[in-house]
Amino acid sequence: MNTSIKSTHFIKILFFYSSIVFCQSFKHSVVMPVPDLSFHPSVFYGLDVLEQMDFKPMYDKSVGVFTNQTAVNRKGHHLLDILKNHSKVKVEVIFTPQYGLFTQQDKRFKMKDGEKYDPDHGARIVEVFGRNMKPPAWSIRDLDLILIDIQDTGVRFSTYISTMTKILEVASEWSLPVIILDRPNPLRGDRVDGPIIRSKFQSFEGYHIVPIRHGLTIGELAIMANEMGWIKDLKRANLTIIPMANWKRSYWLDKSEHPWINPHPSIKSIRTNLSFSGFGLLEGTNLNDGKGTDKPYLIAGAPWLSGYHLADKLSKLKLPGIKILPVEYIPRMKQTDQSPPLYVDELCSGVEIQIIDPNLYDPLATAT
C-alpha cells in the first residue's frame, strides 16, 4: 500500500513537470500574459517584462519585496533602485534570504532603533532565515502584495526556494497576493538529475519533492508548490507569475545578456553553480568541498586523504566533460563565511575538477 501511494505521488510529480513544460493552465496560479517581445533577440526576465508594463500590477499598493543582490534587469539595474524612482509603488518591507540583501557585507542598510532599514525606501529589512524562517505577522499585516525576485541556483538544496515557499504559506494565511518575477534555471531547463527526496528526509535544505537538479525556473517551482499542495495544511496562495520572454529551456544562464551576479557567496560562475549540484552533497561529510578557497565546489579534500591516489583512481573512470587533477590547499576563513570551513588552516590533499565541457559533465556522478 505504501509503495502504491509513493508511486502515485511520483506519477503526479512527473505529470506536473510535463504540464509546466507544455504550458498548461493551472487551477490556483496565474501566468500573466506579457507583451510580445519575439521581435527582439534578447532574453527578457520577469523584471524586464514588468518594466515593459511600467509596474502596473503594483500601482498604488504597499509592497513587501523578497529579494537579494541578484534582482537586476538587462542593464544591471537592481529592482530596488528602479522602484525608488517610481511614484506609484511603495516598498514598505524588504524580506531578505540567507546571506542577506547584498550579502553579509551589505553597506546599503542603516540601523534605526536597533532595526535594519533601507534609507532609499524607508523600508524595514526583515531577515527570513535563521530566527525567522518566514515573515512574522507584524511585517505583512499592512501589505497589499508581496513581490518576489531572486535568482535561484537550480539545485534542490538552495534555501532560497524553501524561503519562497514559506512566504507563499504566510501569504495564503493572510489572503495576500504574491507576484513572482521569473528568472531562468541557470543549469538549463531541459536537464534533470538526481533522486527525488523521500518525505521522511525533508528539511529546509531539502524542502521540495523534486530531483537535486530539478530543471525548473523559480516561477515554475512556485507554481508546482502551489498546485501540488506543498504549502502547509494544503493551503493555496493567490499566486501570479510574470514570465520571461524569449527564454529557451536549452539555455544556460550565461546565454542571456544579463550580467552574472553571484547567487551565493561561494557560487561565482556558472561552472561553479553546475558543480554545486553534485559537490554540494559533500557538506556534512568529512571532506572539505572547496569552501575557504577560491574554487568552492571545484575541489575537495581532507588532511587524511591522498589526492594523488584519488585523482589516479577517478581519472581511470574516464568521467565525461572534465579533467581531474591532484591538488593541495589550505582552507581559510573568509569575510563572507558564516562559519569556518571544514579543516580551516589545515593542509588538505584532494582533487580539482576542471570542467572541459559543461554539457557532458555530470556533477552528481562525479561527486558520488
Regions found by a protein language model. Give the residues of each.
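Glycine-rich, charge-decorated loop segments at or immediately adjacent to ligand/cofactor-binding or catalytic sites
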Residues: T103-K107, I179-F201
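Glycine-rich oxoanion-binding loops at beta->alpha junctions
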Residues: K107, M111-L143, V155
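N-terminal phosphate-binding or glycine-rich loops at protein starts, especially the Walker A/P-loop
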Residues: S42-V89
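Conserved anion/nucleotide-ligand pocket segment
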Residues: Q202-F276
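Conserved functional hotspot residues or short segments at active or partner-binding sites
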Residues: A300-T368
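Short internal beta-strands
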Residues: K90-Q98, L181
